[in-house]
């Protein structure tokens, strides 16, 4: 059994005088049930144990409810149903929580839903991919899964235990054990936030990446071509956005704010482009830390990205 979602988070303005089309997220959201029609499902991963293990600033476990509150009052422009499936809460047993989250993702995908994960630290990424891999392995022997990560960091660290700095190394090891290709594309890498050892590791693993200074409006056509080339090489896409890819002025509420970062219009444009490929199977937003946020700026940006993924 999974805990029921806290529907009290879905509150906001009601513009009934403007008619039926004046809907907002909080009016459209429904609690998930197993007999729900295939639709978008929000699933939270309330964890910052991985951030703690990675020596970061804690508070991301409060990200999922903060993100729901930011979503609640946004105007709703979709026609399809949308459901809240509640949170998987990690505590200090991160590995067990990742397994529960992965199984929940696999079950939801098997029912035909489109899952959008709400973090939580970026340790959500390994759990998300594991769930997608579990689902696809039931139907394909050798699925070509692309991992598209908007992030200032490679998150390929060596460590004795899982953390927010290890998820894509864990995914690489999972792919190797399954004899699957490891197709990892990271957009927004900060050269000053990744050691030479991490760049060497990325090269050994065949990681495709663009630096934050390359992902700028004046270079958008090249960024689009780079992304399109990656998308053409895979059959299924897992997309994850670590909010520290954005400039600190836009997203202060993260463990490791970016001095440079990638502007929100560029990130949102490329997220929508990836979604338009028709290959997107699963997505999540990671590293929202409301305890470090200012005027809900980071939560509002995260909410806009979720809306871009759903509508």
UniProtKB/Swiss-Prot annotation:
- According to its UniProt record, the EC number is 3.5.3.8
**Chain sites annotated for binding Mn(2+) 2:** 151, 153, 242, 244
UniProt cross-references to CDD domains, sorted A to Z: Formimidoylglutamase
Residues the entry annotates as binding Mn(2+) 1: 122, 151, 155, 242
Keyword annotations:
Histidine metabolism, Hydrolase, Manganese, Metal-binding
Per the entry, the cofactor note is:
Binds 2 manganese ions per subunit.
Tell me which cofactor or cofactors this protein depends on.
Mn(2+)
Name one process (GO BP) from the record.
Answer: L-histidine catabolic process to glutamate and formate
Q: Part of which pathway?
A: Amino-acid degradation; L-histidine degradation into L-glutamate; L-glutamate from N-formimidoyl-L-glutamate (hydrolase route): step 1/1
Name the source's superkingdom.
Bacteria
GO molecular function list:
agmatinase activity; formimidoylglutamase activity; manganese ion binding
The reactions it catalyses are: N-formimidoyl-L-glutamate + H2O = formamide + L-glutamate
Role played: Catalyzes the conversion of N-formimidoyl-L-glutamate to L-glutamate and formamide.
Q: What is stated as this protein's family in its record?
A: Belongs to the arginase family.
Q: Give the matching PANTHER family.
A: ARGINASE/AGMATINASE, FORMIMIDOYLGLUTAMASE
Q: What is this protein called?
A: Formimidoylglutamase
The uppermost taxa in this organism's lineage are: Bacteria, Pseudomonadati, Pseudomonadota, Gammaproteobacteria, Pseudomonadales
